[in-house]
Amino acid sequence: MNICVVSTFDGTTDDFMQIFNWAREKLSTSATDMEVGVIREGKVITMGNVTDMEKFQEIMTSEKMKEWDAKHNCVDVVYSLEKQ
């Protein structure tokens, strides 16, 4: 399933890239083609293809991710994408 995640947070793009790079390594068995587009400081779009939703959700709801989200007041809006 192709997804798009719009993340709004208090912090810098570098802050986001640190957690993204941590997650991307963990997600290597459950998602492919993960890419980030920067809208502005504090807002990014992440797109990718989730191949194992259960494993993906496990990583995205991990304690490390929850702590980062709380620290940076991160709100994620997730969309599924379908090629037309």
Residue ranges and their predicted role:
Residues M1-W68, H72-Q84:
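Short S/T/G/P-rich N-terminal loop/turn motif that feeds into the first structured element of a domain
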